[in-house]
Amino acid sequence: MFESLRVGPSGLDLECGPLISRKQQQRVWDFVSDAQHAGIVAMAQGQIVAEAPEAGYYQVPMLFRDVPPTHRLAQEEVFGPLLAATPFDTEAEAVALANGTPYGLVAGVWTRDGARQLRMAHKLRAGQVFINNYGAGGGVELPFGGTGQSGYGREKGFEALYGFTTLKTIAIQHG
């Protein structure tokens, strides 16, 4: 399934477009290089479509397996199509892995168990938690607060208006 991910220019029906700049492309390449030098295996990767211009800032989507929790691929925000997979056996391990980074913008949980869905959502240190999906249904109109070094999202939705409001109390005694 991961191999079917396609990267290319906008206007085509693709899963991923180009990175924002040459600098970001180089940053993503550095993540790939660091992972490979650490012996971390890319177990699957997508493809760049033939229609993609050679000068574009494209990066093949890659799925890395058995990424150590301390490796930068598991600790830093890549902002590119790289996915780090780290196995776990228990909920406690999963929570420790997810909460063991300095970031906490978004988390995802896949389970059919309704009690586990809520239990995990409450334990994960993230401003937004998706259950059985990722990135769908959040919408730009829903506020959320990233945790740690992730903070985008607080300015969305009705709740954000309070940050731009100045309250005033007027007390009048009559008579």
Regions found by a protein language model. Give the residues of each.
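Conserved C-terminal structural/oligomerization subdomain of aldehyde/semialdehyde dehydrogenase
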Residues: 1-3, 51, 55-175
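ALDH superfamily catalytic-core signature
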Residues: 1-68, 131
